[in-house]
Each structure stands twice: as C-alpha cells, then as structure tokens.
Amino acid sequence: EEEDDDEDDEEDVEVDISKCKVTFDEDTHPYTGKAVKPEFTVSYVDEDGDDVDLEEGEDYSVTYSNNRKVSKNAKIKIKGITDNCTGTLVKTFTISKAKQKITAKNVSVSLSKKSVNLKAKCSTGTLKYKSSNTGVAVVDSNGKLNLKKKGKTIITIKAKASRNYKVAKKKITVTVK
C-alpha cells in the first residue's frame, strides 16, 4: 500500500514567521474606546508559489501593544509557536480618530414654557450651540433654549475634535408655537 506523502510533506514545511506576509482585512482601524484588534491573515508562499494561510493558536500567537488610543504606531507581534513555525514578526497599524455622533432631536415647544433643555449628547461631552434666529430662541453653552417669540430657528450643535474623535456637527429645528 502506498502512503499519501502530501500530508507528511506539509508537516515538514518549516516556516519563518519573520518572512511571512500579514494582510489586514480592513484598511482603516477606527478608535473604539477599547483595545483595537484588527482582523488579519498571516501567510507564506509555498514551493509551488501558492499562498498558504497560517492559523492563530496552531501556528502562531499574537500580542498587541499601543492599541487603545489613536496612534500611527499600534503593534501586532506574531510569534511562531511550533517546531516547524518559528520566528517573530512585528507589524504596525494605525488607529484613526472615530466618527463622533451627536444625539439631539428636533424640538416643538410652546412659548409659555419660557425655556427648554436640548438634552444633546456626544462622544466627547463638549458641545457648542448656535441659533440661526435669536429672535425666536437663544441657546446657552449648556444647551438651554430661552424662548423669545413664536417661529422657527435652526440650532447648530458642534462637537470639537478630540484626541480620539473627529469633529461633528448636527442641525436641529426648533419650533416655538
């Protein structure tokens, strides 16, 4: 009986991780508030010229560093963990600023209320407000609307960029009746 040599050959292949190719599934890795662990593939080219993927946990281990904040220098360290898969490779990736979301709703309110709070929120917590028609309503730095007369105004709400978030802007309509 002949044995299938292909299985044995594959076991005998020695792979130096430092010569492997690392391919990220996504080009960008936005800030999440947690450790960023991008999806990636580690592969090598076999003697037939084909790409062969290695398996995390079977062929190599992964450790991360500098991967919690926006950085151009977040790192993945890939280390061979078998007799046939040895060596170490460090790959750098970038964590970009995340989009910031402002939550605020259009407001319809009676003039008799005199004032109302917009209750706007964002990722960084710091918001600036501007009323397009201060004759209808004036808004203070805390998002409190002081109602002046019946009508409509557009309130522009801005969140400044921060270390981890991009600038954001949202417009809401305030109707005073």
How would you describe each model-predicted region?
Residues 1-2, 93-97, 174-177:
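Interdomain boundary/hinge segments at the C-termini of tandem beta-sandwich modules
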Residues 22, 31, 40-42, 60-62, ...:
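Fold-core signature of tandem repeat domains
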Residues 25, 45-46, 74-93, 158-168:
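Enriched for extracellular/lumenal, surface-exposed ectodomains of secreted and cell-surface proteins
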Residues 11-50, 96-126:
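Solvent-exposed, low-complexity, repeat-rich "mucin-like" stalks and linkers
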Residues 99, 113-116, 128-143, 147-157, ...:
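Contiguous, function-dense segments enriched for cysteine-driven chemistry
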Residues 1-12:
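Long, acidic low-complexity intrinsically disordered regions
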Residues 47-86, 130, 135-156:
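Serine/threonine-rich, repeat-prone extracellular segments and beta-strand-based repeat modules
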Residues 17-19, 26, 57, 73, ...:
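Surface-exposed or flexible loop/turn and strand-edge residues in extracellular/cell-surface modules
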